[in-house]
A protein has these predicted regions:
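Accessible peptide chain termini
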Residues: 1, 195-197
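Active-site pocket-lining segments that scaffold enzyme catalytic pockets across diverse folds
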Residues: 1-8
Length: 197
C-alpha cells in the first residue's frame, strides 16, 4: 500500500466486502494466541474493526509505514494479533444447502496471487457437496478469481471457533472459477465454493 502497488490502495472508507462482513483484530482476547499489550515497536495495541459492514476502515500500520502513509501507528508492527471474521447468521448445515452443487475446499496448495491486481490462482482439494450432502472427494483442481469479486460474494456461517491467531467461520464464496479433473472429464465452470478455515 505504501508503495502504491496494492489492489487495496486508497480503499479506506470504501465498501470492499458484502455488507454482512465485519473483520476485527483484537489484541486483548484472554488466552488468544496473538494477544499482546504492545507491538514490536513498543506501541500500545488496541482493538481495530478493520472492516465494518463491508467497509474498509483501517490498514495495519506501524510507525515507519505510518509516516509514509501520513497515518498514526495503530500498534500493528509485526502484523495482526487475533484477527477474525465475525460469525454469520446461518448454520453450517444450512450454508451447505444454499446451492444445489457446492465445492467444499479442505486444503489449498501453493500460492499464486497478484496483490497489485487482486488476481489469484491456487491448487485445491476437497469434496463435492450436492444438496447439502457430501458426495465424493475431488483433487488436482485449481480455483481462481479476483479478490475484489470474491470479497463481495462471501456468506459466513455461524460456526466461528478461536483455534489460531487468525480465525473465520465456514464461508461460502459464489462465482469462483474451478478447473481440473472431475472424475473422468475436465471441469471448467463457475461453482459455489465453501472454505473451512
Amino acid at each position: 500500500i505504501a508503495r502504491g502497488t496494492s489492489f487495496l490502495k486508497d480503499k479506506i472508507n470504501e465498501e470492499i466486502f458484502s455488507t454482512s462482513i465485519n473483520v476485527f483484530d483484537k489484541p486483548d482476547i484472554v488466552k488468544g494466541l496473538g494477544s499482546r499489550y504492545f507491538d514490536g515497536e513498543g506501541v500500545k495495541t488496541k482493538e481495530l474493526k478493520l472492516v465494518d459492514q463491508g467497509v474498509l476502515k483501517h490498514y495495519l500500520v506501524d510507525t515507519y509505514y505510518g509516516k509514509k502513509l501520513n497515518l498514526k501507528s495503530n500498534g500493528r508492527s509485526g502484523g495482526t494479533s487475533n484477527l477474525y471474521f465475525e460469525k454469520g447468521s446461518i448454520s453450517y448445515k444450512n450454508l451447505l444447502k444454499l446451492n444445489q452443487r457446492t465445492l467444499y475446499i479442505t486444503e489449498t496448495i501453493g500460492h499464486g496471487s497478484n496483490l497489485v491486481t487482486g488476481d489469484y490462482s491456487v491448487g485445491a482439494t476437497g469434496f463435492m457437496v450436492e444438496n447439502g450432502v457430501f458426495k465424493y472427494p475431488v483433487s488436482e483442481i485449481t480455483i481462481a478469481g479476483n479478490f475484489n469479486d470474491m470479497f463481495k460474494n462471501i456468506t459466513l456461517a455461524d460456526d466461528l471457533e478461536f483455534k489460531y491467531s487468525t480465525n473465520a467461520p465456514t464461508m461460502l464464496i459464489e462465482g469462483m472459477v474451478v478447473a481440473g479433473k472431475w472424475r473422468t472429464s475436465v471441469l471448467l465452470a463457475q461453482v459455489f465454493l465453501v472454505l473451512q478455515l
